Amino acid sequence: MPKIKTNRAAAKRFRKTASGKYKCGHANRSHILTKKATKRKRNLRQTGHVRAEDAGRLDRMLPYL
């Protein structure tokens, strides 16, 4: 039986932690930043975490991560 392919788009956006959860970056920080508050932009720099409902989908997209 052939190996399962890794979804390369997802592999570039998510990292798996030692506990098996996924971390990712936040959206909304690439352009149109002048109208966003400094506090909001600062909080968007922090790492986000994937919710449990979506982690199952990532497990299928990233079988070897």
Curated annotation (Swiss-Prot):
NCBIfam families registered for this protein in UniProt: rpmI_bact (TIGR00001)
Species whose genome carries this gene: Stenotrophomonas maltophilia (strain R551-3)
Record-given protein name: Large ribosomal subunit protein bL35
HAMAP family in alphabetical order: Ribosomal_bL35
Matches recorded under InterPro entries: Ribosomal_bL35, Ribosomal_bL35-like, Ribosomal_bL35_CS, Ribosomal_bL35_sf
Gene3D superfamilies: 4.10.410.60
One family name in Pfam for this protein: Ribosomal_L35p
Keyword field contains Ribonucleoprotein: yes
Superkingdom assignment: Bacteria
GO MF terms, alphabetically ordered: structural constituent of ribosome
Family membership noted in the UniProt record: Belongs to the bacterial ribosomal protein bL35 family.
KW Ribonucleoprotein (keyword) present: yes
BP GO annotations: translation
Coiled coil feature spans: none
